[in-house]
């Protein structure tokens, strides 16, 4: 009887800890990705108007930050997470992201602009998707897809709220103060929860963390690693390009600040449904097939930005693109965990996220350059459609994983 009671108590504590982990990762992604990553593009047109910067220059901050930070700190962050756990790295990441947004609110020179975008990239690497993915994968064996889907709802929830909050703050206090306020909110939302994360040694609920990790050399010589990496770069590059330019595109169509904010909010609201749906599908069907579906949804949405206008066109785009966006970021760590194991997930995703970060930073710059040259987005959007379809084709060569019962 004492043994039975001890087992029941252990299971109850494990469930409570799992709930805390899901809430913490939800709020971290809500703040660092939803608020910070999706909030910054809302201010691009203000920067362009006040400082006279081109669209290529404005989107180059994200590119420079991730290209400088990603290749070095992405690998180091993955190794540190696997070795010491995510907590300390996440605390540093939250503080750096808050500093970045506050700094960008008064960065009136390109030097300061790039400096604080480096802080932005450091915060994203240390406190964003990578440690959250590892936390979820370490604490969950069964229902990992659902847990990842719930945690990733934080991105959609934060991203849906931030344009509305930013628009309201900007109207009353100006864009400088509203961007600084978002930086303060990021710290207040995420830091307290991250502070109380238990050490990785307590994550005994997932038996996979006791298995020996696959050597990194074996991962780097595995063709599936490159298929997953290149395929994800295609999809992340496409959604990154569209996201960074969506408000600028809407302003070209003479949407007001409020109308543009509501469209962006609809994209992120739709991503909530996408994350739940794709997380549920990922626990039922082969995850490769779910990944292909997501990439095809993204490829289907972008043409709506090219066709002649008709009633509801932008709103239909926002819903379809949002569903694809919701599943895109979430499915990659699930596939990586299936292919290479949870113990090596930090290092594996550290490398893949670096590659994805390169794509996510260069594609918006490319799209901005296409617009600066041709004065429209037509050619750039056509290329993005082709890249999304190429990603679906590449992913189709991955093995089947993740089906219930296998």
Feature annotation, model-predicted:
Residues 63-78, 265-277:
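Central cavity-lining transmembrane alpha-helices of secondary-active solute carriers
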Residues 40-44, 223-276, 280, 363:
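Extracytoplasmic gate region of multi-pass secondary transporters
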Residues 30, 100, 112-127, 233, ...:
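Hydrophobic core of transmembrane alpha-helices in multi-pass small-molecule transporters
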Residues 126-140, 327-340:
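Intracellular juxtamembrane helix-capping segments at the cytosolic ends
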Residues 151, 155-199:
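Helix-loop-helix hairpin linking two adjacent transmembrane segments in secondary transporters
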Residues 72-85, 275-286, 371-372:
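Helix-to-loop junctions at the C-terminal end of transmembrane segments
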Residues 47-48, 80-81, 164-173, 250-251, ...:
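Interfacial helix-cap and linker-helix signal at transmembrane-aqueous boundaries
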Residues 88-102, 289-303:
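Structural signature of the two symmetry-related core transmembrane helices
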């Amino acid at each position: 009887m004492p043994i039975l009671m001890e087992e029941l108590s252990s299971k109850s504590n494990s469930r409570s800890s799992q709930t805390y982990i899901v809430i913490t990762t939800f709020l971290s992604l809500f703040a660092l990705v939803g608020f910070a990553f999706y909030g910054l593009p809302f201010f691009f047109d203000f920067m362009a108007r006040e400082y006279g910067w081109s669209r290529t220059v404005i989107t180059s901050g994200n590119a420079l930050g991730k290209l400088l930070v990603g290749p070095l700190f992405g690998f180091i962050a993955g190794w540190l997470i696997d070795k010491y756990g995510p907590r300390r790295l996440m605390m540093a990441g939250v503080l750096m992201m808050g500093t970045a947004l506050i700094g960008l609110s008064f960065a009136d020179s390109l030097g300061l602009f790039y400096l604080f975008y480096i802080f932005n990239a450091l915060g994203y690497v240390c406190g964003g998707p990578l440690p959250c993915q590892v936390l979820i994968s370490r604490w969950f064996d069964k229902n990992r897809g659902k847990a990842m889907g719930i945690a990733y709802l934080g991105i959609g929830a934060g991203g849906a709220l931030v344009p509305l909050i930013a628009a309201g703050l900007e109207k009353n206090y100006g864009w400088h103060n509203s961007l600084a306020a978002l930086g303060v909110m990021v710290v207040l939302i995420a830091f307290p929860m991250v502070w109380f994360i238990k050490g990785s040694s307590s994550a005994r609920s997932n038996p996979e963390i006791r298995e020996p990790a696959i050597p990194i050399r074996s991962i780097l010589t595995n063709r599936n690693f490159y298929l997953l990496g290149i395929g994800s770069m295609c999809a992340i590059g496409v959604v990154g390009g569209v996201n960074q330019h969506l408000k600028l595109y809407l302003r070209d169509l003479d949407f007001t600040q409020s109308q543009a904010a509501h469209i962006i909010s609809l994209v992120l609201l739709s991503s909530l449904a996408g994350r739940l749906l794709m997380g549920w599908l990922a626990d039922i069907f082969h995850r490769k097939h779910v990944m292909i579906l997501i990439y095809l949804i993204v490829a289907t949405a972008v043409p709506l930005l090219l066709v002649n206008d008709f009633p509801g066109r932008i709103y239909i785009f926002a819903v379809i693109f949002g569903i694809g966006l919701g599943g895109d970021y979430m499915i990659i760590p699930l596939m990586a965990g299936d292919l290479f194991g949870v113990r090596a997930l930090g290092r594996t995703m550290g490398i893949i996220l670096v590659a994805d970060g390169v794509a996510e930073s260069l594609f918006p710059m490319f799209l901005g350059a296409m617009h600066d040259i041709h004065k429209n987005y037509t050619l750039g959007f056509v290329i993005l459609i082709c890249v999304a379809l190429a990603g679906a084709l590449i992913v189709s060569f991955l093995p089947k994983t993740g089906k219930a019962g296998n």
